């Protein structure tokens, strides 16, 4: 995640196609400025939040790619329902990304049925002894599923 315009330029020079902005750590002005800077350089800006109180700020920033972090970064607990509770409050033209707490194909299918456009998976893949197989399981390309 980035907090300064200089980092956006560095990311682009390093070949990045997208950046992550976390609403909880950026004020309104900086959130909009960083998003606009990234987009002016041809990069996508994934604007993430956890606290529902930040959703209006995220949308007001002009974000078209919005991530709901299912992990409470204060307590480090995950709750997949966070995305599902907020889905109807996010306009359909906004690309919705569900982040964290996605453990298996059933979770992916629940999110798909709810209209989530994309997922961000980290811990499940990093804990797997075979990351390729774990990705296949999440995508439903194998008969098995990713275990918890």
Segments the model singles out, each with a brief description of its role:
Residues 1-5, 17-28, 41-55, 67-77, ...:
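Catalytic beta/alpha-barrel core
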Residues 3-14, 50-62, 98, 102-121, ...:
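Catalytic cores of alpha/beta
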Residues 8-30, 67-76, 114-135:
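Glycine-rich phosphate-binding active-site loops on the catalytic face of alpha/beta enzymes
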Residues 32, 79-85:
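Charged helix-capping and loop-helix junction motifs
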Residues 83-97, 104, 122:
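Catalytic alpha/beta core domains of metabolic enzymes, predominantly
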Residues 85-89, 112, 127-148:
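C-terminal helical cap(s) of enzyme catalytic domains, especially alpha/beta-barrels
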């Amino acid at each position: 995640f980035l907090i300064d315009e200089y980092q956006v330029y560095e990311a682009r020079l390093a070949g990045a196609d997208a950046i992550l902005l976390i609403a909880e750590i950026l004020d309104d002005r900086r959130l909009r400025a960083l998003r606009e800077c990234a987009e002016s350089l041809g990069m996508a800006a994934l604007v993430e939040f956890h606290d529902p109180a930040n959703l209006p700020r995220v949308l007001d920033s002009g974000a078209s790619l919005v991530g709901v972090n299912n992990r409470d970064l204060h307590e480090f607990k995950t709750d997949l329902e966070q995305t599902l509770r907020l889905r109807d409050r996010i306009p359909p033209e906004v690309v919705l990304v569900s982040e964290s707490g996605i453990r298996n194909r059933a979770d992916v299918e629940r999110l798909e049925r709810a209209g989530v456009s994309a997922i961000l998976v980290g811990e499940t893949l990093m804990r797997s002894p075979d990351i390729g197989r774990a990705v296949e399981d999440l995508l439903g390309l194998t008969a098995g599923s990713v275990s918890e």
